[in-house]
Curated annotation (Swiss-Prot):
Keyword field: Ribonucleoprotein, Ribosomal protein, RNA-binding, rRNA-binding
UniProt function note: One of the primary rRNA binding proteins, it binds directly to 16S rRNA central domain where it helps coordinate assembly of the platform of the 30S subunit.
Subunit structure: Part of the 30S ribosomal subunit. Contacts proteins S5 and S12.
NCBIfam families with a match to the protein in the record: PRK00136.1 (NF001109)
Name used for this protein in its record: Small ribosomal subunit protein uS8
Amino acid sequence: MAHTNDTIADMLTRIRNATMARHESVAVPATRMTRSIARVLHEEGFVSDWKEEGEGIHAQLVLRLKYKGKGRKPIINGLKRVSRPGLRVYCNHKELPRVLGGIGIAIISTSNGIMTDRDARKQGIGGEVLCYVY
């Protein structure tokens, strides 16, 4: 497994590649951040299930991807990294972006943990805009 500085971008790329190849599941390195993002993706219905395998530095999250219909169209149409190590993006609760008019979600890292833009707006808190999922 290659060592990467941006685990979130790595996770999003792995999910994007797996959905385009119509894979049943995808393994991503387990970190506190990727666990939280996997939890949000599961709560929002973008992945059907996720579990952790292995332990310590070799721990991996296995996400079961969702498809719809006979043509097995992916539920996840796009993933976009917003804030990155070279250019952080922060928003207060009034500036939080709406993804595709509310169809997609923005995943925000707040002082209350990682949550969707909808939850952050409801709680009246802003934070770092990690990525868009639609």
